[in-house]
């Protein structure tokens, strides 16, 4: 009988979006427990070694982290398997680079560089609102932050903008039709569009219909929707492709056009 937490993760069982090949080893880095789920996070080691290529081995990543160069959401993190996740800001002071973890249209975390101005805040989805001891209202976000005394107008599924220096709420966006959103789970992972309507299904999952900038419509569960802007204006910079998923034929045409223009 297994006692205690699992300490290993086999490479074959690791999430597909980490893009680890099967044959280089047996194990993958098992993310530490933290603000994001194992299947929805990107451990620091994979970001630094496999994405940015700043290190060749896990030992080198450890040496980088132990010099306290890497900050996530403004806090120094020395754990190489720390689970960074959606909307997290990763800052490397030594190189002056800032990244925000955002999905591309294929559902992987893109290496998305942002300005130092944008690195000062992040957006969080409100997961839960409750009244704690002595009647103090609390709010819990998707990255496990608990904030006391929030604005009473903020409800579940809204998005709040958090100042990373202070951890305070600076602004919020209501979950409403006509607002820009990103899909953070399911088959449409990484797509961005405007919410057109919400079907309520009591006792089951509410379905949200979304329309992207090209006019394609798709539907997903409410739990997968993350509002990122008011109207058509996103509050964060978006990665290449702007969250519009192309069909296979469109991708092929785009590739051929790029090839011809360069060739």
Curated annotation (Swiss-Prot):
Q: Which PROSITE patterns match?
A: RIBOSOMAL_S4E, S4
> In UniProt terms, what function does this protein have?
Component of the small ribosomal subunit. The ribosome is a large ribonucleoprotein complex responsible for the synthesis of proteins in the cell. Part of the small subunit (SSU) processome, first precursor of the small eukaryotic ribosomal subunit. During the assembly of the SSU processome in the nucleolus, many ribosome biogenesis factors, an RNA chaperone and ribosomal proteins associate with the nascent pre-rRNA and work in concert to generate RNA folding, modifications, rearrangements and cleavage as well as targeted degradation of pre-ribosomal RNA by the RNA exosome.
InterPro entries membership? KOW (IPR005824), Rib_uL2_dom2 (IPR014722), Ribosomal_eS4 (IPR000876), Ribosomal_eS4_C (IPR032277), Ribosomal_eS4_central_region (IPR013845), Ribosomal_eS4_central_sf (IPR038237), Ribosomal_eS4_KOW (IPR041982), Ribosomal_eS4_N (IPR013843)
Protein name per Swiss-Prot or TrEMBL: Small ribosomal subunit protein eS4, X isoform
Q: How does it assemble?
A: Component of the small ribosomal subunit. Part of the small subunit (SSU) processome, composed of more than 70 proteins and the RNA chaperone small nucleolar RNA (snoRNA) U3. Identified in a IGF2BP1-dependent mRNP granule complex containing untranslated mRNAs.
What organism is the protein native to?
Homo sapiens (Human)
Q: Where is this cross-link: Glycyl lysine isopeptide (Lys-Gly) (interchain with G-Cter in SUMO2)?
A: 230
An example GO BP is:
translation
Superkingdom of this protein's organism: Eukaryota
Q: According to the UniProt entry, which residues carry N6-acetyllysine?
A: 233
Family label: Belongs to the eukaryotic ribosomal protein eS4 family.
């Amino acid at each position: 009988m297994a006692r205690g937490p699992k300490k290993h993760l086999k490479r074959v069982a690791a999430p597909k979006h980490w893009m680890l090949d099967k044959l280089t080893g047996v194990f993958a880095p098992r993310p530490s427990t933290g603000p994001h789920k194992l299947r929805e996070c990107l451990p620091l080691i994979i970001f630094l070694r496999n994405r940015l290529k700043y290190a060749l081995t896990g030992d080198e990543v450890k040496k980088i982290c132990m010099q306290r160069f890497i900050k996530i959401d403004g806090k120094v993190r020395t754990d190489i398997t720390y689970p960074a996740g959606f909307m997290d800001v990763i800052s490397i002071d030594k190189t002056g680079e800032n990244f925000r973890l955002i999905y591309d249209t294929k559902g992987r975390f893109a290496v998305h560089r942002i300005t130092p101005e944008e690195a000062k805040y992040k957006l969080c989805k409100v997961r839960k609102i409750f009244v704690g001891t002595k009647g103090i209202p609390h709010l819990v976000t998707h990255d496990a932050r608990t904030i006391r005394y929030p604005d009473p107008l903020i409800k579940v599924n809204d998005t709040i903008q958090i100042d990373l220096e202070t951890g305070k709420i600076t602004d919020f966006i209501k979950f409403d039709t006509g607002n820009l959103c990103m899909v953070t789970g399911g088959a449409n992972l990484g797509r961005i569009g405007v919410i057109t309507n919400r079907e309520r299904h009591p006792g089951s999952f509410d379905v949200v219909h979304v329309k992207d900038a090209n006019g394609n419509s798709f539907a997903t569960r409410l739990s997968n929707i993350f509002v990122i802007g008011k109207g058509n204006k996103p509050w964060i910079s978006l990665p290449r492709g702007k969250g519009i998923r192309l069909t296979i034929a469109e991708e092929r045409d785009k590739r051929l056009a790029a090839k011809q223009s360069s060739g």
